[in-house]
Amino acid sequence: MKEQKWIHEGLITESLPNGMFRVRLDNEDFILGYISGRIRRSFIRILPGDRVKIEISRYDSTRGRIIYRLRNKDSNY
């Protein structure tokens, strides 16, 4: 059975080494996010200030996988 995950939107606040980022979620929580393989293969640039969709495991809510970078028109803000 596939693991259930939460999907949230957030803002990249800090870039860390090895494709890791500090992400502030819309509910004001800070988590550590890493780039998914699909984004890494497509050479999509993620910079501080970008809005992203992040997938968070139910078992470890302090880390998440960045699955999509939102364009300005995709964002709610």
UniProtKB/Swiss-Prot annotation:
Q: Which GO terms describe its cellular component?
A: chloroplast; cytosol
Where located?
Plastid, Chloroplast
On whether Ribosomal protein is a keyword of this UniProt record, the answer is no
Q: Which UniProt keywords apply?
A: Chloroplast, Initiation factor, Plastid, Protein biosynthesis, RNA-binding, rRNA-binding
Span of domain S1-like: 1-71
Primary subcellular site in the record, as a coarse category: plastid
Q: Which domain of life is it from?
A: Eukaryota
| Keyword Hydrolase annotated | no
State the Gene Ontology terms under molecular function.
ribosome binding; rRNA binding; translation initiation factor activity
Q: Which family does it belong to?
A: Belongs to the IF-1 family.
The record describes the protein's role as:
One of the essential components for the initiation of protein synthesis. Stabilizes the binding of IF-2 and IF-3 on the 30S subunit to which N-formylmethionyl-tRNA(fMet) subsequently binds. Helps modulate mRNA selection, yielding the 30S pre-initiation complex (PIC). Upon addition of the 50S ribosomal subunit IF-1, IF-2 and IF-3 are released leaving the mature 70S translation initiation complex.
Which HAMAP family would you find in this protein's record?
A: IF_1
Q: How does it assemble?
A: Component of the 30S ribosomal translation pre-initiation complex which assembles on the 30S ribosome in the order IF-2 and IF-3, IF-1 and N-formylmethionyl-tRNA(fMet); mRNA recruitment can occur at any time during PIC assembly.
Name recorded for this polypeptide? Translation initiation factor IF-1, chloroplastic
